[in-house]
Amino acid sequence: MDFGGILLHLEARSMATVLIAGLLVYWVGSAIFLAVLHPLAKFPGPKLAAASDWWLVYHEWFLGKSLTDILFDLHQNYGTINVPYGGLQDLWLDMDRIAYVVQSLTWESALEANSLVKLHFSSMQAYSDIYNVKSKWDKDPEVYKAIVDTSSAFGLRNYHEAKERRDLIWPFYSRQSVQRMQKAINRQISFLVDQLDKQNQEGKLSNMSMAFRCLAQDIMADICLGKSFGTLEERDFGSPLIHALDEGLESYVLMKSFPTLRNILYSISAMVTLPGEAEFATYGTIVADHVTRGIQQPDTIPPNTMLGFLVPTSSNTAKEAPQPKLSQGHMTEELQTFVIGAGETVASAMVQGLSGILQSPDLYKNVYEEIVQVWPETDGPVPPIEVLEKLPLLTAVIKEALRLTHGVVTPLARVISAGGACIDGHHVPGGTSVGTSHVFIHMSSDYYDAPDEFRPERWLGSSSDKHLVAFSKGPRGCMGINLAWCQLYLVLATLVRTVQMEYPADLNDIKIKWKDCFQPLYYGRPLQVRCTRAEGHS
């Protein structure tokens, strides 16, 4: 009898038993600590939610509930101040989170907060305390790594690293710079109008939900690279890239809920095709090729593009060619982030704005008459943004569209620095992940009458923009805010002025439906419109 083999077998089983028992003790001990003894245990909320990430995984993944709906239910049941909605049951499985604790906090503060426990606030005061220029907090890696895993300005989680990158890129998206982009934007809008007219001549309704997404995609490619991807040319606006973006959003909850699975899939991405990854790779390669060619031949880069901004062209007086502002790898990641999918939120606002206009004949008429005042002839030049932004009703429509589409809907979580912070009058320890979803501000009856209704008139007169947070606020707010406003003005003004639109109410949903997948993932019927080119416009 092989006693040595038996002993080895028993020792292996014993070690496995000890390991499993140790993990169970840690698991149960952590849950009890988080639910009862943790500094955040004083806040109201279900104890299971405070004790374990699995509570949220169960409701979000297995029951299929939207995170914002879950948070609304929690605040309704436990109060409007703050609600714990996730513990740290799987810390031992997620090495990224362990590394984050080690790098970002002292062990003392990590033990105090037990690292990255999530806390959601619903008040405007809390929003202001979290998202302001003085809050130099990192992004929660758990939330952001599930949507983007790059070293782009958006993907960088460390505040100081992100600030350095934003300071470099921000001048390209300044108001003055965006004013020079109007030619490129109008070029793509003109092509959209041609496509809408073509569909009308074929006897078709136009799917404006897809049309706006294709338009926003082509605008971003034109602005960043000097050449669009041609998504507007796809039949019925059925761009594979747009469908890939939806596939990516559909996988967000899975990637967020199971970080270990996410890390494994990323590590074997060469062998396993992730949702939408094939299309992303194709378009990512196109961007990378533009960067390579631009670095090698900078004088061939089209003017007023982001690539041209990052790769300055040489001048006759320069002794040496100017160096790119970023490494080739970082430049490629930055441009890929902006080009692929960065126009999604503004496209959503276009859909909401046009839907709101067309559902109200009086509003349609009034907006049209306002635009005619500055654009008397349809075949005349499109008024510049400096003129359109002075139109009060058009501006009100855009603000209301932004309010009802929210931008990003998931709480943009920030990790409080060591030492803690005061949020809405409450001390929150360092290491806590805190956030407020834009939806809680935009849909609050404390700030808006009938918040679920499209009422542009609420923005006329002395109404304040304080509670409009679609682009977020603070040092990590949306860099493309000026560009987004410019697109919304030019797109809505052009369509209302140069296209006669019919809205078949029986084929459209009164309200746009979505699920929280970081950005809204829209479902239900798309916005269908019959579009006829206005007389005199060609």
Curated annotation (Swiss-Prot):
Role played: Cytochrome P450 monooxygenase; part of the gene cluster that mediates the biosynthesis of flavunoidine, an alkaloidal terpenoid with a tetracyclic cage-like core connected to dimethylcadaverine via a C-N bond and acylated with 5,5-dimethyl-L-pipecolate. The tetracyclic core is synthesized by the terpene cyclase flvE and the cytochrome P450 monooxygenase flvD.
Give the membrane topology, semicolon-separated if more than one: Single-pass membrane protein
Pathway-wise, it operates in: Secondary metabolite biosynthesis; terpenoid biosynthesis
Question: Transmembrane stretches, by residue range?
Answer: 17-37
- Extract the SUPFAM superfamilies matched here: Cytochrome P450
Q: Where in the cell is it found?
A: Membrane
Which InterPro entries does this UniProt record tie to the protein? Answer: Cyt_P450 (IPR001128), Cyt_P450_CS (IPR017972), Cyt_P450_E_grp-I (IPR002401), Cyt_P450_sf (IPR036396), Cytochrome_P450_monoxygenase (IPR050121)
Q: What is the lineage of its organism?
A: Eukaryota, Fungi, Dikarya, Ascomycota, Pezizomycotina
| Biological process per Gene Ontology, one example term | terpenoid biosynthetic process
Q: Does this UniProt record's set of keywords contain Metal-binding?
A: yes
Protein name (Swiss-Prot/TrEMBL)? Cytochrome P450 monooxygenase flvC
What are this entry's molecular-function GO terms?
Answer: heme binding; iron ion binding; monooxygenase activity; oxidoreductase activity, acting on paired donors, with incorporation or reduction of molecular oxygen
What is the organism of origin for this protein?
Aspergillus flavus (strain ATCC 200026 / FGSC A1120 / IAM 13836 / NRRL 3357 / JCM 12722 / SRRC 167)
